[in-house]
Curated annotation (Swiss-Prot):
Mg(2+) 1 binds at D317, D321. Keywords: Lyase, Magnesium, Metal-binding. A motif (DDXXD motif) lies at residues 317-321. It catalyses: (2E,6E)-farnesyl diphosphate = bicyclogermacrene + diphosphate. This is Bicyclogermacrene synthase. Mg(2+) 2 binds at D317, D321. It comes from Phyla dulcis. Sesquiterpene synthase converting farnesyl diphosphate to bicyclogermacrene as the major product. Binds 3 Mg(2+) ions per subunit. InterPro entries: Isoprenoid_synthase_dom_sf, Terpene_cyclase-like_1_C, Terpene_cyclase_plant_C1, Terpene_synth_N, Terpene_synth_N_sf, Terpene_synthase-like, Terpene_synthase_metal-bd, Terpenoid_cyclase/PrenylTrfase.
Length: 565
């Protein structure tokens, strides 16, 4: 029996009328892409051929880059600029070992190099690259840029690049670095004031840093796509690096298109638009989201698992928020706890498709885990979805009772219902040998590093989505809790919560500094989820409302190749 063809919300809507049921529908707009990403066999063959054509050229260019890194090893400034270019251009994943060695060498020489060096650009770039890599370098190197009154000495307009690099560096600050807190604001104001007088490519860089995302908080693929044409405009650019960046970007795009086509075919089988029309039909946006978590070829299996599970989490979230009655949600939660196909007959018709699909996807995950020799991970994945659903139901109980919790009470539950603890667990499942059992237990214990990511993700989501959500029967957000508890205005509440987000980024930065309990590939999954939120939610909920800017981002990564000529 094909449940996707036989079960539909439409079938139950007539029953709702006769039973006088009112549902909290959100009226999400439909999928904006249609079947655009569904490739036929000839398209897939062509993508594979295009990727193979690039591989040989890429390998030759990679050897050349290794030589260049070796040649630059004794020249501090040349080496940090080369590492910076490689990272910004988006192909650093090919050179992780070489970059680790280079930055270890730079760290050993950093203090001596910066001690009497009054070049703001050089000091800032060195600080940022080392902090990004987890090195505990001191911000005291910037004391020499203060006047006798302790104020940051702003340079003349000829040194804008130095201030821009310093502004980027301040995004790596941690708690207690008051110097960087103050000068983060000052450097931003300075860049805003000089931007109208700048010309490209510097104007493009400054505008991007101010109005898009800092290097620390942006998505690697988008940042690379933006930086390539900027880098090319500088006379000092390295043609070797630029060509490798373009070829590698296009090769990855071909791989990602193949993956998205396969996932789109799976999603089409569920037929959300027909069978679950109350839910967000967002497989393309989900895939974009997961590219922000990991884009590298080695994580292809992990990526497919995470896209499928996150898509199902989205449907379950919408079922709890925008369709299910309290009684239906209770039955669904109990069925997930039992985790058995025998529960199918107890569920409302429209929920049967969701439940059956969850079990099928988890059967696939179990097969993959057995193949990888990591079958113990499946239990963590199952508990992740059970735990999330339990917390969704607790939220539904609050909504049913029209209960307004305190801000702290709300945050304790909201950090769980945002789903990111569960998603981080799922993101680890297919990552291979780098993940040990202890890593799952670490995430579940919600250490400060993980909690910081959850807090950022929850607050940013609440800030941009609270007004739309409160138009229907929806549980209160952080904004409403803060307004009621502090007896303040909505605007003041949003300002305060944004300040908390900025402060919590310091906790994330601190958690990345060495020594760390777990290897950086695991830490990056946690960090990258917050980066995605910064990109997709800071200006609005672009997952729910897929407007022109979000569509443009998707075109850049998944439709339009980079011009290599």
């Amino acid at each position: 029996m094909d449940l996707a063809k036989q079960i539909s919300v439409v079938d139950s809507s007539l029953q709702d009328v006769t039973r006088n049921i009112t549902r909290p529908l959100a009226n999400f707009h439909p999928n904006v892409w249609g079947d655009r990403f569904l490739l036929n066999n000839s398209d897939q063959v062509q993508l594979k051929m295009n990727a193979l054509d690039k591989e040989e050229a890429i390998e030759k260019l990679k050897e050349g880059v290794r030589r260049k890194l070796k040649e630059a090893s004794n020249d501090y400034m040349r080496l940090i600029q080369m590492v910076d270019a490689i990272q910004r251009l988006g192909f650093a994943y090919h050179f992780e070992e070489e970059i680790d060695q280079a930055l270890q060498c730079l760290f050993e020489r950093h203090h001596e190099y910066c001690k009497d060096n009054h070049d703001l650009y050089a000091n800032s770039l060195s600080f940022r690259l080392l902090r990004q890599q987890g090195y505990r370098v001191s911000c005291e190197i910037f004391e020499k840029f203060k006047d006798v009154k302790g104020n940051f000495m702003l340079p003349n307009n000829g040194e804008v690049m130095g201030v821009l690099e310093f502004y980027e560096a301040t995004h790596l600050r941690v708690h207690g670095e008051d110097l960087l807190d103050h000068d983060f604001v000052l450097s931003r104001e300075y860049l805003e004031s000089v931007l109208p007088s700048l010309t490209n490519p510097l104007a493009e860089q400054v505008d991007h840093a101010l109005h898009q995302h800092s290097n620390r908080r942006g998505l690697s693929r988008l940042e690379a796509r933006h930086y390539m044409p900027v880098y090319e405009q500088y006379a000092s650019h390295d043609q070797y690096l630029l060509k490798l960046a373009k070829l590698d970007f296009n090769m990855l795009q071909s791989l990602h298109k193949e993956e998205l086509s396969e996932l789109s075919r799976w999603w089409k089988g569920i037929d959300v638009a027909r069978n679950l029309p109350y839910a967000r039909d967002r497989i393309v946006e989900t895939y974009f989201w997961i590219l922000g978590v990991y884009f590298e070829p080695e994580y292809a299996a992990a990526r497919k698992i995470l896209v499928k599970v996150q898509s199902l989490f989205s449907i379950i979230d919408d079922t709890f928020d925008a369709y299910g009655t309290f009684e239906e949600l209770q039955i669904f939660t109990q069925a997930l706890e039992r985790w058995s196909i025998s529960c199918l007959d107890q569920l409302p018709d429209y929920m049967k498709l969701i439940y059956k699909t969850v079990l099928e996807v988890y059967d696939e995950i179990e097969e993959e885990m057995i193949k990888q020799g990591t079958s113990y991970r499946t239990a963590y994945g199952i508990e992740a979805i059970k735990s999330l659903t339990r917390n969704y139901f607790m939220e539904a109980e609050w909504r049913e009772k029209k209960y307004t919790p305190t801000t702290d009470e709300h945050m304790r539950l909201a950090l769980k219902t945002c789903g990111y603890t569960s998603l981080i667990i799922i993101s680890f499942l297919g990552m291979g040998e780098v993940v040990k059992r202890e890593a799952f237990d670490w995430v579940l214990s919600e250490p400060d590093f993980v909690k910081a990511s959850l807090t950022i993700n929850r607050l940013v989501d609440d800030i941009v989505g609270h007004e739309d959500e409160q138009k229907r029967n929806h549980v209160v957000s952080s904004v409403e809790c803060y307004v009621q508890e502090s007896k303040t205005s909505r605007e003041d509440a949003v300002y305060e919560l944004n300040s908390r987000v900025e402060s919590t980024w310091k906790d994330l930065n601190e958690g990345f500094l060495k020594p760390t309990k777990f290897p950086s590939p695991l830490l990056y999954r946690v960090l990258n989820y917050s980066r995605v939120i910064e990109v997709m939610y800071t200006k609005g909920d672009w997952y729910t409302n897929v407007g022109p800017e979000m569509q443009d981002y998707i075109r850049q990564l998944l439709i339009d190749p980079v011009n290599v000529e």
